[in-house]
Amino acid sequence: MKFSELWLREWVNPAIDSDALANQITMAGLEVDGVEPVAGSFHGVVVGEVVECAQHPNADKLRVTKVNVGGDRLLDIVCGAPNCRQGLRVAVATIGAVLPGDFKIKAAKLRGEPSEGMLCSFSELGISDDHNGIIELPADAPIGTDIREYLKLDDNTIEISVTPNRADCLGIIGVARDVAVLNQLPLVEPEIVPVGATIDDTLPIAVEAPDACPRYLGRVVKGINVKAPTPLWMKEKLRRCGIRSIDAVVDVTNYVLLELGQPMHAFDKDRIEGGIVVRMAKEGETLVLLDGTEAKLNADTLVIADHNKALAMGGIFGGEHSGVNDETQNVLLECAFFSPLSITGRARRHGLHTDASHRYERGVDPALQHKAMERATRLLIDICGGEAGPVIDITNEATLPKRATITLRRSKLDRLIGHHIADEQVTDILRRLGCEVTEGKDEWQAVAPSWRFDMEIEEDLVEEVARVYGYNNIPDEPVQASLIMGTHREADLSLKRVKTLLNDKGYQEVITYSFVDPKVQQMIHPGVEALLLPSPISVEMSAMRLSLWTGLLATVVYNQNRQQNRVRIFESGLRFVPDTQAPLGIRQDLMLAGVICGNRYEEHWNLAKETVDFYDLKGDLESVLDLTGKLNEVEFRAEANPALHPGQSAAIYLKGERIGFVGVVHPELERKLDLNGRTLVFELEWNKLADRVVPQAREISRFPANRRDIAVVVAENVPAADILSECKKVGVNQVVGVNLFDVYRGKGVAEGYKSLAISLILQDTSRTLEEEEIAATVAKCVEALKERFQASLRD
């Protein structure tokens, strides 16, 4: 919003300069974007009168004039402006004057005729871009007066950013209120004398949409001269606010809009059939707007209509049919309060953003309409003449906004501000803001003024008190708080540490929606009940996920469709499992899951193209589990999962409790999801791993280690992990390493059996092991394997 500094000072005039005023407005929460002078830098320009005006003898487009500037004689000035005429009061740059751009006025001859000055246009004085003719001043402009003084050009245009909550400051009155409060000065409002009705002419008004339009005022003004010129003082105020003068009627409504923040509209009364009806638009109804475009209206659009057709979009834009034109003699002035919700979004739907819709969307003072109507009527009659009828007021009190009583507690005020403000100051601030205040014990009861829609809760009052008291007046004090430092156990494993490990292994973290497609989820978890949303964003996002695989596999498909075939991603997040024993019937588990597919390595000339397999993912997963210190307690067991390949998957158990799955996606599921090639997934219940085993320091043996290899034949269904676990258990004191380095099936091994080659690393921390001890330990392992798994040594 732009406004004139001098216009603001007519309402409240603090004893501070322009820079201090701009800073004060900014600190009040109305950020000043710029302060610009309203005219260029010039001097030596005065008010003059064209006494004589004749055609130049040597030029068709020039005139020779004699101009009275209040001196001893008339000045001879040659002028080329088409509007130059005898009797006109003008702005005269006399000899010695300096105009914007350091243009100096000197005596000269133009086509043989002497010229002792220049008759100036607005553009030549740096006031506006209007260069169509010289400035036409009122007939009563005092001759010889400095034009800067007469037009009050020692003024600034202040532009502010008004936040949506401060709609009351979209008018001079709102900004003036804040400045008056901050400087503890009275607000000097212009005297608005009610215009009594001198005629009985009215139009019937019916409000059929009281929720959208709680108050509607209409007034007939007859016999106006719409061609009457707008006074220069009004044009200048409008210009300094960024509004171009149109005609007297439009200028008056714009003036009231800028002054009071109340949008108004004028209809050509003679084009209204029957009366005014405020209603919602009919489906498919159209309206030709003032700019000539046709708007197709929706049923939720408020319209001002007569008994046959729509005349205007309520609170947004007028219609062409009922607009004021050069032939208009009788008008109906409209002044209304429209509910913000009935206007919000309607203008944008039609590609519009008007000054009226901007204000109505944010909220207009519901108590302002009578004042604005009287102000507009007085200005219109003073400028255009005419006679006014009575004001017709249709108000639905039940739908008008009501201001609730807000309690402000002393404890809350002190706690949020961090500084004690005296009771009498708090009361004074609230009352200066326009609140009705009742003081209590350590509290205040306040009713916000009608123009402050943003004052609704206790925190709003705290903000207002702090703002008016002055943020700069609140002393800087160290924050005093009782801090309870959070404990961090050494046994806590940070999920961030695990993510870093996966990042180092080439994985990228993703975040997918918790809302998933129930059809896809049923493919991954057939027969498992999921939580369905009553009001989903879409059908494809109508179920809560049972695992992270649904979103991760969809991400893989998305990337493969964009030629990204090597994918390594992971995600941590909640799954939502229906559980009657859980709060609200839903168990929320924090999960860690990942997916890999494509080549094992990035493409490189020295590396063969090898596709990832089960052991690639299992190795990465073991690295994660190793961070917990529980890898030795983890078992990978063959266990069916409908989403995984039955021969290339495993359930993950920790101390006998299942904590997740790892494996290749089932070929049938791959086909249904349009996955390209082998895809492997894992998922872990993170909360069962977050408590890690703290590593214990131990002595490093200075004595040599001994390796012994054995090959044992066992049944095909015996897991190799069980064999390794048994070897560790038997040789717990001397066996420091057990590793499976070969699996053989074929000649020499019976069908249904396999040969496992295992290395045993034996070492003692206190001495060198004797060969007999080593042999005894190896024999003990073989015997244990024979007893438990019916294993035999392979020849």
Swiss-Prot record:
CDD domains: PheRS_beta_core (cd00769), tRNA_bind_bactPheRS (cd02796). Residues 401-476 form the B5 domain. Belongs to the phenylalanyl-tRNA synthetase beta subunit family. Type 1 subfamily. The lineage of its organism: Bacteria, Pseudomonadati, Pseudomonadota, Gammaproteobacteria, Enterobacterales. Tetramer of two alpha and two beta subunits. Gene3D superfamilies: 3.30.56.10, Bira Bifunctional Protein, Domain 2, Ferrodoxin-fold anticodon-binding domain, Nucleic acid-binding proteins, Phenylalanyl-trna Synthetase, Chain B, domain 3. It is found in: Cytoplasm. Keywords: Aminoacyl-tRNA synthetase, ATP-binding, Cytoplasm, Ligase, Magnesium, Metal-binding, Nucleotide-binding, Protein biosynthesis, RNA-binding, tRNA-binding. Its main location: cytoplasm. One of its GO terms (molecular function) is phenylalanine-tRNA ligase activity. It is an enzyme of class 6 (ligase). Its EC number is 6.1.1.20. InterPro entries: aa-tRNA-synth_II/BPL/LPL (IPR045864), B3/B4_tRNA-bd (IPR005146), DNA-bd_dom_put_sf (IPR009061), Fdx_antiC-bd (IPR005121), Fdx_antiC-bd_sf (IPR036690), NA-bd_OB-fold (IPR012340), Phe-tRNA-ligase_IIc_bsu (IPR045060), Phe-tRNA-ligase_IIc_bsu_bact (IPR004532). Residues 701-794 form the FDX-ACB domain. This is Phenylalanine--tRNA ligase beta subunit. GO terms for cellular component: phenylalanine-tRNA ligase complex. Residues 39-148 form the tRNA-binding domain.
